[in-house]
Amino acid sequence: MDLVTIYSRKECHLCEEAFTVLQKLRADLKFEINEIFIDGDEDLEKLYGEQVPVTLINGEHHDYWKVNPVRFKSSLEKHRQHQ
């Protein structure tokens, strides 16, 4: 099963919105979600800083700030074709 990772911050409204979109898409598209909070992790804060939420599909960068459902579905399909 595909793994979607979302790097988030606590009390981040964009992060909450992105996570909600992913949860809705998961029902139809069948993937797992792993949410990682970057708060307090110096390396992740340097890497992602103000770009959160950052989404990865199977470990590869997908997008940041928002999850566009159409773009996400397209990217997930491309990942599945190359597996």
Where are these regions (language model features)?
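A generic structural signal for alpha->beta connector loops
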Residues: L3, D28-E32
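Non-catalytic, surface beta->alpha helical segment in thiol-disulfide oxidoreductase systems
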Residues: E60-Q83
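Local sequence-structure signature of Cys/Sec-based thiol-disulfide redox active-site neighborhoods
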Residues: M1-K24
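Generic recognition of short, well-ordered alpha-helical segments
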Residues: E17-T20, K46-L47, V67
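A short, hydrophobic beta-strand/beta-hairpin element that forms part of a small beta-sheet core
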Residues: P53-H61
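Thiol-based oxidoreductase modules, predominantly thioredoxin-like and allied folds used
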Residues: F31-E42
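Short Fe-S-cluster ligation motifs
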Residues: G40-V54
